[in-house]
Structures are given as C-alpha cells and as structure tokens.
Amino acid sequence: MARYIGPKCKLSRREGTDLFLKSGVRALESKCNIEAAPGIHGQRRGRQSDYGTQLREKQKVRRIYGVLERQFRGYYQAAASKKGATGENLLQLLECRLDNVVYRMGFGSTRSESRQLVSHKAISVNGKTVNIPSYQVRPGDVVAVREKSLAQLRIVQALELCAQRGRVEWVDVDAAKKSGVFKNVPARSDLSADINENLIVELYSK
C-alpha cells in the first residue's frame, strides 16, 4: 500500500477530528471544515456498526502517526506480545518512533515533515545519523538536528510553533542547540484522551 500524498484536510474530515497533519500556522478551521465529511456536499453517514466504529478508530490512529496498514498491524502484534495492556503498549510503540519524537521535540512542524527530516539524514541519535523513521527511541537517547541542517528555515519555524503550543513532558529540549533528550516512555494518561485504543484491540482480536 502506497503512502497517502493527497489533501491532508480530506483525512481529517473523514475522521471528523483534527489529526494534527497540518503545521498549525493558521487555525485548522480556516482550512478544513472537519465537521463535514469529504466531498462537495459533505453529508455525514448514518449510524455506524460496531465494526465500522472500530475501523474508523484504527484508521484515525494510523493516520495520526503516518503509519501504513502493514506497519500498524506489526505494531499491534508487537504490543500484544508484551506484558501489560495491549492498547497502551501500541500507543507507546508509536510514540517511540523516531519521526514522532522529532515532532514532539519541535524539530518538525508535523509528523510528515519530521519523517522527511529523518529520511533526509538531518537527525542524529546519540551522535549517530539515523535515517529510519520507525527507529525506536529509548529513554535517555539524545536526539538532535545534525550540524549541516541546523540553519534550515523549516526547523527554525517548527521550533517557534512548538514553543507556542508547548512541549510534552517526556522530552527535554535545548532549542538553541536543537537537541533534546527522550526522558521516558509516556504513560497512557500523558497521551490524547481522544483516542480509544480499546476499539483497535477489539478490531484486531476478531
């Protein structure tokens, strides 16, 4: 399955919520009418079945983190094999992706831009260049913008946007040095309450 490269607003409208696919330079409401479904008329569908609700939740989370279906299923299988709640394990594995950590630290304005920074070798982990977006960052790892990319305007702008919206508590960032430490894996209570991971577990358990 190829990665989606179409309009980001269409995805947010499909799920009926902000998927944080846009940079936030302008208010989402000025660009996307997320209350309306995709299409010219944007009419909402009728009541969803239980399966439909579970599928939509899975698609929402998959699109938030920019993960393909095959990758997402792999994360679920890894989460199910670990101790603890499968749903929480799944979200933690997604949060530990390098492209997501780069986004959380504010080096990219979106996860998509952060993934591009990683792929273009603009990011290092513990002093070594890593160009794999799915690389699992561990507590204590130092994630930084490489010297050759420090002056990139999009990184400077992303840091400014992040300063406005605020950073998460599980990363410690030195914006001047464009470097940060991944302090710990976030607990479920630290993550979005708008995600119902139990629906995803129910979907894959069938």
UniProtKB/Swiss-Prot annotation:
GO molecular function: rRNA binding; structural constituent of ribosome
InterPro entries on file: Ribosomal_uS4, Ribosomal_uS4_bac-type, Ribosomal_uS4_CS, Ribosomal_uS4_N, S4_RNA-bd, S4_RNA-bd_sf
One Gene Ontology term from the biological process aspect of the record: ribosomal small subunit biogenesis
One GO term describing the cellular component: small ribosomal subunit
Domain S4 RNA-binding: 96-160
Record keywords, A-Z: Ribonucleoprotein, Ribosomal protein, RNA-binding, rRNA-binding
Xref: CDD domains: S4
Record's subunit section: Part of the 30S ribosomal subunit. Contacts protein S5. The interaction surface between S4 and S5 is involved in control of translational fidelity.
The family this protein is said to belong to: Belongs to the universal ribosomal protein uS4 family.
Task of the protein: One of the primary rRNA binding proteins, it binds directly to 16S rRNA where it nucleates assembly of the body of the 30S subunit. With S5 and S12 plays an important role in translational accuracy.
Name this polypeptide is given: Small ribosomal subunit protein uS4
Organismal lineage: Bacteria, Pseudomonadati, Pseudomonadota, Gammaproteobacteria, Pseudomonadales
Gene it is expressed from: rpsD
